[in-house]
Amino acid sequence: MLILGHPLIPSDRFIFIKNTDGIHSSTNNDIVCFEAHPKNLELAKYCCENGVHFSVIFLSHKIETDTFFLFNAFKPLYCIFKDIKQAILAQQHATNYLLDSKILFSMDLNDTELWEICAKNQIDGVISKDSLL
């Protein structure tokens, strides 16, 4: 299981962006991230075509299956979910369709119950909710 954002475990820095200007102000080691909204598909395409490492954050409590697969066509490093039920469903899709993107659940890393749920459902990884401000 990947663990991102833990103070004792080194990980890349996530930078929330809204447009390509945000990409230009990031460093090569940063992972840019943005909301999984259909209006951001162009941003995902830009990242894919220009070799920019990016992640997509699914904020909704209801995953839009078409949006999930459309964003995955542009090969994000991570698909980050704030809702555990959506993370579990996305993980099933990622496993069944052999997607390259890793599924992460954004959580309080001190919540032992959520760790158990993630492990039981074989979620690829977790990320501290504090890493995504």
Where do the model's predicted regions map?
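Residue-level detector of alpha-helical secondary structure
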Residues: 45-48, 91
